[in-house]
């Protein structure tokens, strides 16, 4: 399916796409992406799925990139998530694009009531002209 025929475009950004090898957020690259998103967002619904919270958390906490236990990686991600969202928010604001955040766990997709609630949240964000 081509983008022009799609109603919703989901953009998946991996850690190495948004965070450089030194653990810094790639502002210039993301800024360029947002320019493109602004154009598509006129006619399409856009969803951004991004990684990078652990990498930014490691940078902020000055933790060297190495294997860390799950419990610690979740804490590092919790800290990094704040920085990740902040960076995205600043860049989207420059383009006057509203954004929202939806945090989803596997349980949310496996239980019908929760899945319907998530769908409703997405639809309401689209109604508000915000990019989740």
PLM-predicted stretches and their roles:
Residues 1-131:
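Nucleotide/pyrophosphate-binding catalytic subdomain
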């Amino acid at each position: 399916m081509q983008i022009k025929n799609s109603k919703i475009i989901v953009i998946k950004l991996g850690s190495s796409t948004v965070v450089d090898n030194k653990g810094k957020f790639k502002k210039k690259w993301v800024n360029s992406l947002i320019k493109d998103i602004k154009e598509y967002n006129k006619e399409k619904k856009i969803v951004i799925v991004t990684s990078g919270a652990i990498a930014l958390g490691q940078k902020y906490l000055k933790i060297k990139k190495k294997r860390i236990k799950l419990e610690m990686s979740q804490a590092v991600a919790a800290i990094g998530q704040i920085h990740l969202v902040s960076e995205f928010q600043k860049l989207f604001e420059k383009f006057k694009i509203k954004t929202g955040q939806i945090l989803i766990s596997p349980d949310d997709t496996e239980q019908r009531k929760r899945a319907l609630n998530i769908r409703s949240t997405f639809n309401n964000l689209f109604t508000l002209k915000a990019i989740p």
